[in-house]
C-alpha cells in the first residue's frame, strides 16, 4: 500500500506543486516552518499589516470530505484509475477501539500521500483568500490571516469562516481563534513573531531546558 501511495505521490506532486499558493509551507518540497515565520514577519513590515487572525481548525485532517478531495484532484487529473486508487485509499477504513469501520471523511494520518491530499484540499481556501487580496500564511492547518485594522481583521475572519466551514465542511474552533496586534507578538509554529524580531515561545524553551536536565547526569 505504501509503495502504491509513494508512486501516486511521485505522479501527483509535480502536477499540483507549481500552482499551490506561495504562502503555503507545510509538507511541501524545499519549504519549512522557518520560511513560514519569515513570510509572516515580512507581511508585518512590508505591507503594514498590524493585526493577525490566528485560525484554529478542529481536527482538520479527520474532517476532510472524500468527495471534495477527489474533486480537487480531478481539477488536474482525469485518469479514472488514479482517482479510483485515491478513493480506495481514503475509504480503506480504520481500526477504532479494536473494531474495523469504514470512513467517508478524513485522510488517514501517517499515509504517504495524506499531506499532499490535505494541501490540495486546503488550496481552495488559499486561492479564495488570494482572489480577495487577503494575505495569509498557512503551514498545514496552522493559518494566519493578516489585516491593517481590527475592523478589517473581523471582516477577513468572517470570510475565512465562510470558506473553511461553508465550502470545505471544516470546523473552526471559535474559542481558540483570535485576533491580536502584531506588537503583542503572534505565537506561531513554536515561535513568537513581532514586526522587528522573532523569538522562541517560552514553553519551547522550558521544554528544551527540561530535556537537557533529563539528559544531564546528576552528581
Show which residues each predicted segment covers.
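General helical structural elements
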Residues: 6-9, 142, 161, 208, ...
Amino acid at each position: 500500500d505504501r509503495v502504491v501511495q509513494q508512486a501516486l505521490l511521485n505522479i501527483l506532486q509535480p502536477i499540483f506543486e507549481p500552482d499551490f499558493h506561495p504562502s503555503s509551507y507545510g509538507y511541501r518540497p524545499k519549504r519549512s516552518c522557518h520560511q513560514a515565520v519569515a513570510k509572516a514577519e515580512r507581511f508585518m513590515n512590508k505591507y503594514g499589516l498590524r493585526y493577525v487572525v490566528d485560525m484554529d481548525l478542529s481536527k482538520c485532517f479527520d474532517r476532510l470530505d472524500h468527495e471534495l478531495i477527489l474533486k480537487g484532484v480531478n481539477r488536474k487529473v482525469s485518469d479514472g484509475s488514479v482517482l479510483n486508487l485515491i478513493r480506495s485509499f481514503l475509504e480503506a477504513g480504520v481500526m477504532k477501539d479494536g473494531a474495523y469501520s469504514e470512513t467517508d471523511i478524513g485522510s488517514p494520518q501517517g499515509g504517504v500521500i495524506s499531506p499532499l491530499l490535505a494541501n490540495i484540499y486546503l488550496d481552495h481556501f488559499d486561492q479564495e483568500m488570494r482572489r480577495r487580496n487577503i494575505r495569509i500564511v498557512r503551514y498545514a492547518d496552522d493559518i494566519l490571516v493578516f489585516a491593517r485594522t481590527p475592523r478589517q481583521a473581523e471582516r477577513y475572519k468572517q470570510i475565512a469562516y465562510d470558506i473553511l466551514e461553508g465550502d470545505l465542511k471544516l470546523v473552526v474552533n471559535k474559542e481558540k481563534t483570535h485576533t491580536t496586534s502584531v506588537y503583542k507578538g503572534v505565537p506561531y509554529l513554536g515561535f513568537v513573531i513581532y514586526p522587528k524580531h522573532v523569538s522562541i515561545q517560552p514553553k519551547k524553551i522550558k521544554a528544551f531546558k527540561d530535556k537537557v536536565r533529563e539528559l544531564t547526569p546528576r552528581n
